[in-house]
């Protein structure tokens, strides 16, 4: 993503909006392999997508996904004695995640072909 000088402020704002728009899809995708708790979801997203989320961001998203019947949640005792709330996709959540993934891939492929000339020019300028 963009650097942090004043010249890139507009790009940074755009990137922040892009991340916000993708969070629900990213959380559903992070839950696709199986059940997970909040901090684990945060780590998964950071590792795979460079999305850095706080607990104050992830839990409202998870609650909204629960209200929309896209995820289920269950409290489970952990080895440390502190219960953890594990989230998993519902059937509806799996269907929604698959639809979002398909739409995203089509969108990203189209944009990639559109952006390629811009990237080629930038690469050529570095040589």
Predicted regions and their residues:
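Glycine-centered, phosphate/nucleic-acid-interacting loop/turn motifs that mediate DNA/RNA or nucleotide
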Residues: 69
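Short beta-strand "wing" residues that participate in macromolecule-binding interfaces
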Residues: 73
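Amphipathic alpha-helical dimerization/coiled-coil segments
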Residues: 3, 95-127
């Amino acid at each position: 993503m963009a650097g942090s000088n004043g010249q890139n402020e507009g790009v940074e704002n755009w990137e922040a909006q892009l991340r916000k728009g993708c969070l629900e899809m990213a959380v559903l995708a992070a839950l696709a392999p199986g059940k997970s708790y909040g901090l684990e979801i945060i780590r998964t997203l950071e590792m795979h997508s460079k999305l850095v989320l706080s607990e104050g961001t992830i839990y409202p998203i998870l609650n909204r996904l629960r209200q929309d019947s896209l995820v289920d949640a269950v409290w489970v005792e952990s080895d440390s004695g502190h219960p953890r709330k594990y989230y998993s996709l519902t059937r509806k959540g799996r269907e929604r995640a698959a639809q979002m993934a398909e739409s995203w891939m089509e969108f990203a492929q189209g944009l990639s072909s559109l952006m390629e000339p811009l990237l080629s020019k930038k690469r050529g300028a570095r040589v």
